Every structure is written in C-alpha cells, then in structure tokens.
Amino acid sequence: MKQQAKSRKPQQPEYIFQVETLSHEGRGIAHYGSHPDHPADKHGKKVFIRYALPGETVKAQITHEAKRLEEAEMVALLAEPSANRVEAVCPHYGICGGCSMQHIHPDEQIRLKQNVLQSHLQHFAGIQPEQWLEPIRSLQSDYRRRARIGVRYLPKQDRLILGFREHHSNRLTSIHTCSVLDKKLSDSLPELRNLLQSLKGKVHIGHVELAKGDHETSLLVRHIEKLNNADVNQLRQFALHKGWQLYLQPKGPESLRRIDEEQGAMRLHYALNAFDVNFAFSPLDFTQVNATVNEQMVQLACELLQLQQGERVLDLFCGLGNFSLPLARCVGAKGVIVGVEASEEMVQRATDNVKRNNLVQASFFSQDLTKDFSHHSWANQGFDALLIDPPRAGAYEIIQYVPNFGAKRIVYVSCNPATLARDAGVLVQHGYQLKKAAVMDMFTHTEHVESIALFEKIQEIND
C-alpha cells in the first residue's frame, strides 16, 4: 500500500504488533506486550491499527494516544498476509478518506458488517433475529451514481485540487480516478479538473456535485461569488459536449438554477423496473447512491411486508417515494399508501412522482417526525404495515407511537446499526418480534453498515 508511506510522521514511534481481531470499522486490534520492544508501562494497552488484519505481524506508527487506547497506521507487513487481504484497486487508497476497506476481501467485509449488526442487537436490545437473510450485495465495483467532490485553488502554485478529503482531515487530496464512482463519471474527472483550472473564478468554487440518473447526468457547481459570463459559457460548452445538465448554486439550495434550460426541466430520472415505476429527482435530492442495491432493497422490503391487495401502509421518512411507489403497486388500486417526510420539497417531489406513475392510492404529508404528530389526521388512521427508513439518528420518537398504528408488520431500513438496535429494543417492549434481518452492502469498501429488519406483532392468546 504505497500511498500510506506519504503520510508517515517520523517523530511518532513505530512498533511491531501481532494483530488479533478487527474492530467494527475494520481496523486491526492489537495489544502492547506481544513484542520485546514494547514499552513496559504500556503492557496490555489496546491499539487500533489502520490497514492491519487479524493474524498479521505488522510494523505500525502511532498516530494518536489516549489513556486507554492508541491509534496507529500500518507502515509495513512483516510476515505472510492474511488470507482476507487483497490488493486495493484504487491508486489513491490510503490517502483519500472515501474508502476504508479496499484491502479487505469483499466476503470478509460483508461478514464484518453482519457481525457489527449482530453485536449491536445483542448489546443494545438483547435480541437476535429468528432468521438471518442472505446479504444484499453490490453487483458492480463502480457503484456510486453521485458524489460531492471538493475544489480548492492554490494561487501560489497555480494549481487546482479536485478531490476528496484525506482520512480524518479537512485537507483535500487530488484524485484523477475513483474506483467506486460510476465509470463514466470517474473517467471525466481529469477533463473536469482541467476545465475548472481554466476558469477565471476558480478561487470561488467550493465543490462540484456529479449525479447520474438512468439516462442523464448532471454537473452542479457550488460557487461563493458570481462567475463571469466567460466562465459560465465555458461550463455550458463543457456540459453540452458531455451531454450533461449544468447547474449553478451560489448560495443555499433555493439558489440552484439550471443553466441550459433549453435542454429540459430541472430533473434526472431513475426507474425500478420490477415495479414499473419511474422517479424524477433534482441534483440536490437525496437518492440512494447504489442503484443495484437500492432495487434489491426495495424488492426485499415488499417481500417481507407480504402485502395484499387493499391493505394500508404507512411509509415514514418517505423522501421522494423510493419505497412508496413500489408499495402502491403491491397494494393495488384499492389499497392506501401514506408517506410522511419532513421536507416539503421532497413531499412535493413524491406527489409529482405519484402523478407521473398514475398511482392515485398514495398521498404524502410534510411533518418533522421528531416532534409530536399525534394530532395529525394521518397519525390517527390504522395501518396494516409500516415501513420506516430513518436517518442515522434513528426513529426513537416514532417508535414510541407505533402501537397506535396497529400495524402487524414493520420493515425497518437502517443506516446505523446502533440506532436500529436501540429502536428494536423498544419495538420488542411494544410486543413486536424481530423475525428477519439482513445487511446490505450499499457502500462497498467502507465501514458503513446498512441493514433491513422485519418485525411482526406477537399474537395475543386469549384465555
């Protein structure tokens, strides 16, 4: 891993360690005392070593010291590598902070993520699912269909950096390729960097965002000062050449404007073909970055809910309708889908998507789900099933209210195993049982753990 050597700090000590196991985020764990050169006063102290794997003997440089543990970075592998070690595919791996597990075999990444979920469920809720489902895997390595890429101009060097932040740093590292970014987007990075370098107002550009629909691509340029007409025209010509939509954003989200309006409305699109639904979205809208995992996830959610024609489903944190529209197909014209989302703009987007797909059985409401919502009409209806897809903070406030919905089945989609486990414990207290769970490799080569879980209401037995 040649990239790592560039970040070594000679003043920091280096030691030899025997790596014992992996932490939840994929770092090797070792202890002082396993080698004669270890300081005696550190005997037994735990060390977390980036890039090291269990069973390996490594030389590592200490990067951070605390009272009970230390952090380090592997600088040399001294013996046979672990069977789970693979060669990182990205030339920027080790400096760029985007990926953290490219050195770990994909199967081991999945196993580690499932262990993380199992551990959190046991620790926070004291439960395990009755059945572990097969993990949902990414079907391609270049899975990311959107990315925010930092821009920084260095006047003294007359050099523009286009790239991602370094690990645990605000410093940008320049990249010319990204192995997890959609290949067409990745291949465009050098050309995009050269374009930005040529602009007079490059010092005013903070970042760019690339987003890809099924058939369209957008380039969004975030700038803090107005760009002159010549710069805007250069950007426009680049977008025309690439066949991309071009957007400028000088301030907040409300300032977003499309420059090449003659090419169409401010929209990208993606489809979930298994459900015959199509979504329109803006470059700033939240969409899942991994298209293949998203489609598998939506299919599994619908299968787990076992929806029947005419049933009523509540979709909480519904966004632009990624689950709502497929659920509407499952319950048919006589069913009811109610979607709730904090963002009024996303509620409007979901409503528009329902109309474009002729799904009259779905309706949407704007509501901050961390606040009291019990007085709203939608909250006082009965539902056969719930789908909950919260942010990392989880859905603790909503979970308290769940018994009032009367749902027999709940599918919880999570991007944080700790908050899923916490909320699962509350659901169990409310009389639900964790039936099935699976991890989803939405963010391959990173420590992020996405998961999906099915809870079913325990039937009460009358005496």
From Swiss-Prot:
User: What Pfam families does the record tag this protein with?
Assistant: TRAM, tRNA_U5-meth_tr
Where does this protein hold S-adenosyl-L-methionine? 288, 317, 322, 341, 368, 389
* Annotated positions binding [4Fe-4S] cluster: 90, 96, 99, 178
Entry keywords, A to Z: 4Fe-4S, Iron, Iron-sulfur, Metal-binding, Methyltransferase, rRNA processing, S-adenosyl-L-methionine, Transferase
Q: Which InterPro entries match?
A: 23S_rRNA_MeTrfase_RlmD (IPR001566), MeTrfase_TrmA_AS (IPR030390), NA-bd_OB-fold (IPR012340), SAM-dependent_MTases_sf (IPR029063), TRAM_dom (IPR002792), U5_MeTrfase_fam (IPR010280)
Active site located where? 415
Membrane-spanning intervals of the chain: none
Gene3D superfamilies for this protein: 2.40.50.1070, Nucleic acid-binding proteins (2.40.50.140), Vaccinia Virus protein VP39 (3.40.50.150)
Q: Report which superkingdom the organism of origin falls in.
A: Bacteria
Q: Which residues form a coiled coil?
A: none
Q: What class of enzyme is it?
A: transferase
* Biological processes, Gene Ontology terms: rRNA base methylation
Q: EC no.?
A: 2.1.1.190
| Reaction(s) the record says it catalyses | uridine(1939) in 23S rRNA + S-adenosyl-L-methionine = 5-methyluridine(1939) in 23S rRNA + S-adenosyl-L-homocysteine + H(+)
* TRAM domain residues: 6-76
This entry's Gene Ontology molecular function terms read: 4 iron, 4 sulfur cluster binding; iron ion binding; RNA binding; rRNA (uridine-C5-)-methyltransferase activity
NCBIfam families annotated for this entry?
PRK13168.1 (NF009639), rumA (TIGR00479)
Record's function text? Catalyzes the formation of 5-methyl-uridine at position 1939 (m5U1939) in 23S rRNA.
The protein's name is: 23S rRNA (uracil(1939)-C(5))-methyltransferase RlmD
